[in-house]
Each structure stands twice: as C-alpha cells, then as structure tokens.
C-alpha cells in the first residue's frame, strides 16, 4: 500500500475563470470548525447554476428530492406501487449521492446504455453531443425473484431495511448484471478480496434495474454528523457566501496528518501567488462504505475537528463537508469519480496524493495500482478538461526539521515515510509518532479509536450509521 506521504503542487495548472467575489463574506471564530447555516433544499430537479462557480456537468445540478409541497402525495403513491425493492446500506448511499446531484447529470440509477458507456469509456455522451466523465457504475442490483415480481411494471418503490419508502424509480429498465466484467473493468482484476466487490457485487442479484429517481425526503443519518453533510447546491451557496474566487478540493478517507495539511496550505499559497484573492479549501472526507481497517467516519470527523481547533488548517478558509459516496478502492478509475463529483460541488481545482483510491493487492504482497497513475489519468480523462488537476511532489517526515516537508531526493536519508500500517500500529500500541507528524489532539482521537475497538464491537470495527429518509 502507498505510504501516508502527501503530495503537493509544483507547477502552474491551467487557470480557470475567476469566481464571483462576495465582499460580505462572513468571518469565523479562530479555532473552531466551520458549521454553516444551510439554505433550504433546492426544490427543482434541474437547477441551472448561473453563479461564477464552475458549471456542473451537463450545465444543471440535479436535485432528485421531491418538493416539500408534494411529499405527502408522493409518499402515498409510493405506498400504492405494488413492486418494491429493499435497499441495503450501499444502495442507500448511492441514493443519497444521486439525490443531491453529486453524479449530475444522472437522474437515477443507470440504464444499460449509461452503464455500458461508463464501463467501457469512463464517460457518457449527452444529447447535445458533449461528453461528461463517469468512471464508476451507479447501479441497483436485483435478483431473479425481484425481477419476476416487478413483471411489466414501469415503476418500483425503493424501501429501507424495515420497509419504509425511500424513493420511487420510474421508467425502469432491467438488464443483465455482468458481474465478472464489471469487476474486471472497474478494478483491473477479479481477485477475491476486493472490499467493495465483496460487499456489493459478488453476492448481488443477476440483474440491474435503472430508471429516474424521485427521492421522497432528504437523506439523513441522525448520527450527529448531518450538519456536515452539505449537498453540492449547499456547498455552492457557501462558497459564494464566503466570496471564494477559487475552490480547491481535497478528498480523503483517513485522519489528517501534517503532510496532508502541508499539501493543502501550500496549494492555497500557490493559488494566491497566481492572483486569486480568496481561495477556499473544500476538505471533503468520504462518508460512505469503507473497508474494515479504515477509521470510521465518526472518529475521522472528531479528528478533523481537532486539526482545525489546533490551527493546523485555517477554519476561515476551509469548508469541511462529508462526501456521501461509498469507497470502491478502484484506484485511477475511481479517482475520476471523486474529481467529477467535486466539479458538481463547485470545485475548479482538485488535489491528488500518491495512489489515490488505491489499496494493497488482495492476494499478493504489492500495491494494486501504480502510485503515480491516478494523477496521470486525471490529466487525460475525458470530461474532466474543465477541472484543474494540480501537479505535485511528495512530502514526508523530515527528521532534521522535525516536521513534514517536501521530499528532497538529494538528502533522502533525512526523510521518513510513515505508512498507514505504521501509523495504525503506533496508535494501537498507544505510542506517539515523531513530533510534527500529526497535531497531538488529533493523534489522541486516533489512539482513543483503537482503544475503543474491543470495548465497542469485539469484531474490530465500530458500527456506522445507516441512512434514512
């Protein structure tokens, strides 16, 4: 697996158009994490974004949540639809992603034409001939019995684990689920042990069902973290309110160490040098399914709060918001999805580290992907031409300075690369990393998490909240 060394910009990316500047942007108390007052959910299914922010894919930000005035009627309709599909946790996370427009211009689970284009081209073509990036299938699997029960129906109701209606899927299309090909093309291997494939594909049904989604209510988790779950439309409102003239996004699924912070703060410095006046960081931790040895979201968010409280990142120029997508660990294929979703959230700059969305090979002692392929693929990916992918160099722990710094190959003996495995081992033993690797209060959260494992679960993983409407 890739080490926890970070990556940092070293060259000038293509410069995009400036964003609207709001001279009345609010200020934030130092040392506190930014929690914004959210606007009302946008009620139209297709919101034409006319602000100075980068336009979402397809020019419209999809909002698939039913208008509040129509929810009672639609809930009644959902109860009367005879065909029902029970959603699992990952299915619900994809409903959340789709409902808020992260996957715009998708209007629901993929039909076969969208699925095939995604699988073979990592993109699909719109009616006007333009191409948008889409590298991971967003699909809903059903089994033979469910397909039989649906019959000739044109719509189905999607329900949660206890039968509560979540959404209606309209104008449906059912087609074969080519599991082996899907796994091979998404991960580049069919080896056993791929976390997402084991969770959501290999045991799933032999059919896929696509259609247009009508989500009955905004998806909530009621886990104390919903205040951090800003939709793309809400994030865009916040960036305008802050007067951002550039938005740079950082995706992560791990605790923030000082190498990450160096990456983010130096990126802002370089954007200021380029002439931007108020670049804003979107720190966008992944909030959906993750593999068993990743730190759960609730603990990561506690750690992120400490990072801002300790001033490692500036809360006045940082927006912390949860990205609701499941994690596929599909390397260069998946990192395109991560980048595309941030366009829809308003980001025009995207930072990548080493081995983005990567993991160790499930059956061999090596990394599954080349650590540099993610950044290279992003610079060439169809449909991502509008997004500025920042070139970078590696950062590691500089023993001579006692802090994370940019790696200097001329004195490589002075640098220490602390892998994720090494970091977890230290935390489990309640040992401290080298001074300057992570802020002490953030490290304590990590130690407390590993200390809590046996007490809270006995199976090595703290349970996570499940979405509900």
UniProtKB/Swiss-Prot annotation:
Its EC number(s): 2.7.7.4
Localization per Swiss-Prot or TrEMBL: Plastid, Chloroplast stroma
Tissue-wise expression: Expressed in roots and leaves.
InterPro entries with a match to the protein in the record: ATP-Sase_PUA-like_dom, PUA-like_sf, Rossmann-like_a/b/a_fold, Sulfurylase_cat_dom, Sulphate_adenylyltransferase
Listed pathway(s): Sulfur metabolism; hydrogen sulfide biosynthesis; sulfite from sulfate: step 1/3
Gene Ontology annotations for the cellular component aspect, listed alphabetically: chloroplast; chloroplast stroma; mitochondrion; plastid
Transit peptide: first to last position: 1-51
Keywords, comma-separated and alphabetical: ATP-binding, Chloroplast, Nucleotide-binding, Nucleotidyltransferase, Plastid, Transferase, Transit peptide
Similarity comment text for this entry: Belongs to the sulfate adenylyltransferase family.
Alphabetized NCBIfam families for the sequence: sopT
PANTHER family for the chain: ATP SULFURYLASE 4, CHLOROPLASTIC, BIFUNCTIONAL 3'-PHOSPHOADENOSINE 5'-PHOSPHOSULFATE SYNTHASE
Name of this chain's protein: ATP sulfurylase 4, chloroplastic
Species per Swiss-Prot/TrEMBL record: Arabidopsis thaliana (Mouse-ear cress)
Organism ancestry: Eukaryota, Viridiplantae, Streptophyta, Embryophyta, Tracheophyta
Gene for this chain: APS4
């Amino acid at each position: 697996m890739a080490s926890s060394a970070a990556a940092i910009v070293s060259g000038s990316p293509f410069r995009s158009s400036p964003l609207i500047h709001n001279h009345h942007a609010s200020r934030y108390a130092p040392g506190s994490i930014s929690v914004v007052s959210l606007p009302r959910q946008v009620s139209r299914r297709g919101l034409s974004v006319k602000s100075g922010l980068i336009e979402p894919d397809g020019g419209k930000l999809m909002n698939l949540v039913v208008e509040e005035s129509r929810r009672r009627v639609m809930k009644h309709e959902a109860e009367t639809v005879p065909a029902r599909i029970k959603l699992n946790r990952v299915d619900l996370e994809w409903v959340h992603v789709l409902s808020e427009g992260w996957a715009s211009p998708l209007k629901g689970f993929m039909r076969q034409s969208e699925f095939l284009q995604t699988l073979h081209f990592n993109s699909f073509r719109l009616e006007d001939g333009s191409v948008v990036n889409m590298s991971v299938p967003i699909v809903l699997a059903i089994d033979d019995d469910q397909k039989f029960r649906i019959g000739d129906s044109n719509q189905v109701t999607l329900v949660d684990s206890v039968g509560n209606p979540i959404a209606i899927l309209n104008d449906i299309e059912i087609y074969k689920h080519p599991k082996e090909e899907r796994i091979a093309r998404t991960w580049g291997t069919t080896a056993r042990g791929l976390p997402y494939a084991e969770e959501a594909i290999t045991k799933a049904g032999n059919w896929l069902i696509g259609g247009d989604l009508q989500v009955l209510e905004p998806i909530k988790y009621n886990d104390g973290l919903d205040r951090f779950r800003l939709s793309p439309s809400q994030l865009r409102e916040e960036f305008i309110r802050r007067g951002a003239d550039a938005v740079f996004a950082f995706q992560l699924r791990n605790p923030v160490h000082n190498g990450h912070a160096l990456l983010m703060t130096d990126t802002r410095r370089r954007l200021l040098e380029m002439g931007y006046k108020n670049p804003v960081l979107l720190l966008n931790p992944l909030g959906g399914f993750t593999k068993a040895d990743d730190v759960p979201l609730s603990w990561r968010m506690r750690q992120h709060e400490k990072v801002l409280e300790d001033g490692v990142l500036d809360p006045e120029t940082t927006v912390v918001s949860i990205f609701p997508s499941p994690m596929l660990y599909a390397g260069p294929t998946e990192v395109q999805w991560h980048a595309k979703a941030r366009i829809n959230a308003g980001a025009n700059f995207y930072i990548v580290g080493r081995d983005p969305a990567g993991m160790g090979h499930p059956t061999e002692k090596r990394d599954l992907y080349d650590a540099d392929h993610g950044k290279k693929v992003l610079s060439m990916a169809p449909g991502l031409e509008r997004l500025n992918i920042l070139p970078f160099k590696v950062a590691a722990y500089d023993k001579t300075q006692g802090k994370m710094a940019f790696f200097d190959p001329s004195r490589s003996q002075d640098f220490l690369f602390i892998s994720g495995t090494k970091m977890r081992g230290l935390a489990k033993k309640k040992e401290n990393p080298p001074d300057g690797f992570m802020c002490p209060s953030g490290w304590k959260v990590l130690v407390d998490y590993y200390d809590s494992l046996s007490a809270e679960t006995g199976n090595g993983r703290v349970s996570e909240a499940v979405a509900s409407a």
